[in-house]
């Protein structure tokens, strides 16, 4: 089933310039709708960890992009207090109280999640935004005005602080999604974009910006990482001097490994999660 679905999506991707809401064949529509439905239910993911490596299902990302070719914009109501005009419906548009109870997470108004995103049990969405294809795992808090970009993968027991930006893959087009692994803390107003991976148990301080070209300097070893924060790192904003010493450029600095003191400052509050 999955192989046939993948083959259909891959072929549709090759023919994408000829697709439109009026011309798309039914089998393509059904295939894309199938993928979006599975993403919404959490039974399919854009990226999955196999062993120590993350494997990106590029065909799933293609299906997300194709969905924008297959739908016209349409008016959408948000509880009668706001109107939107978009191609992608909101995740909770037709949910009942029973649906929310079964899903087991909290949504604080006016948080928005698009259909095709997945939110796991005991997660908390403060007034925030979760885009299509994103996966937010158990016990994670998406704090006020944080954004989880398209196809981003957020692990278990993660805290995305106020105003955090997690980049997406749709525009500008990125090869791989941003991945925040389990038990990470991302400080207020930090940005993680361009497919950067923050490995498990790491703490990113307030106001740190991470992209593929950002130097991530380990002050203990002198090593410089790109596109990956090693597991258990505590990272702050900093700068490194140029070779000629005339100027310095922004970087992120690994100042230490997570210890008990760090954990005490960034621990999650169980009172905010669960039933």
From Swiss-Prot:
One of its GO terms (cellular component) is cytoplasm. It catalyses: (S)-2,3,4,5-tetrahydrodipicolinate + succinyl-CoA + H2O = (S)-2-succinylamino-6-oxoheptanedioate + CoA. It is found in: Cytoplasm. GO terms for molecular function: 2,3,4,5-tetrahydropyridine-2,6-dicarboxylate N-succinyltransferase activity; nucleotidyltransferase activity. Its EC number is 2.3.1.117. Keywords: Acyltransferase, Amino-acid biosynthesis, Cytoplasm, Diaminopimelate biosynthesis, Lysine biosynthesis, Repeat, Transferase. It comes from the Bacteria. Signal peptide: none annotated. Its main location: cytoplasm. It is an enzyme of class 2 (transferase). Pathway: Amino-acid biosynthesis; L-lysine biosynthesis via DAP pathway; LL-2,6-diaminopimelate from (S)-tetrahydrodipicolinate (succinylase route): step 1/3. GO terms for biological process: diaminopimelate biosynthetic process; lysine biosynthetic process via diaminopimelate. HAMAP family: DapD. Belongs to the transferase hexapeptide repeat family. This is 2,3,4,5-tetrahydropyridine-2,6-dicarboxylate N-succinyltransferase.
């Amino acid at each position: 089933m999955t192989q046939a679905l993948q083959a259909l999506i891959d072929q549709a991707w090759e023919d994408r310039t000829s697709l439109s809401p009026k011309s798309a064949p039914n089998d393509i529509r059904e295939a894309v709708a199938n993928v979006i439905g599975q993403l919404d239910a959490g039974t399919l993911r854009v990226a999955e960890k196999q062993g120590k490596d993350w494997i990106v299902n590029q065909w799933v990302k293609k299906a997300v992009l194709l969905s924008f070719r297959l739908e016209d914009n349409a008016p959408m109501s948000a509880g009668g207090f706001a109107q939107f005009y978009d191609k992608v419906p909101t995740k909770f548009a037709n949910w009942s109280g029973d649906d929310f109870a079964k899903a087991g997470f909290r949504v604080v108004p006016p948080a928005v999640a698009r259909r095709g995103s997945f939110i796991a049990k005991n997660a908390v969405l403060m007034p925030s935004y979760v885009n299509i294809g994103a996966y937010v795992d158990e016990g994670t808090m998406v704090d006020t005005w944080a954004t989880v970009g398209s196809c981003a993968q957020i692990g278990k027991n993660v805290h995305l602080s106020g105003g955090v930006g997690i980049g997406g893959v749709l525009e500008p087009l990125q090869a791989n999604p941003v991945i925040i692994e389990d038990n990470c803390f991302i400080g207020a107003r930090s940005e993680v974009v361009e497919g950067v991976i923050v490995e498990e148990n790491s703490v990113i301080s307030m106001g740190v910006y991470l992209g593929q070209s950002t130097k991530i300097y380990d002050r203990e070893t002198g090593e410089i990482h790109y596109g990956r924060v090693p597991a258990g790192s505590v990272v702050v904003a900093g700068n490194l001097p140029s070779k000629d010493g005339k100027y310095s450029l922004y970087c992120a600095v690994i100042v230490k490994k997570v210890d008990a003191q760090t954990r005490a400052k960034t621990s999650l509050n169980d009172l905010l999660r669960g039933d």
